[in-house]
Amino acid sequence: GEKFGKSIDGAITLDSEVTIPYKLFKYFFNSSDEEVMGYIKLFTDINPKDFEELNKATLESPYKREAQMYLAKEITKIVHGENGLNDAIRQTEGLNRGNWEILLDKDYEDLYRNSEKTSELKREKIENGITIQQLAVDYGLCNSLSESKRLINQGGISMNGQKIEDSNKEISIQDLKADKIIILSKGK
């Protein structure tokens, strides 16, 4: 249950009940080139020969992020087990590479539970009719309807990983993931 990181704000917890596999994996994958080998020495039981080979590969081709991948996989496996590691890899593939169709209902539930930015949307609001444009404003993604419409028209708003092309699109119950979650995101 100890916090790990430079500051409490950016820290993760090495507790499988608190930090989901995706967040733990992502945190260690984002380790800097300067820190990663020290973390590997500190947190894993890599043998000296493999450590030297990984260090050499990292120095020669840091852009491949082999050491970060090794660290992220090992720490996630230690904290969450093999199933947790598989969840983290699937969630990373789904969210970071736009491969949303591979995500499972449990992935959406994990991501929602561990998200810092969530809002509650009453089911009756969907049933009564709300457009994506209005939803983006009501839940703080955009400051105004005109900003929302402009972003949608420019391909800058996604719902559940799909770019929204029609600012008048009505949200429906079928848009809910795990029967209760909608993920709105801003940016191309």
Regions found by a protein language model. Name each.
Residues 2-188:
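Conserved nucleotide- and phosphate/pyrophosphate-binding catalytic cores
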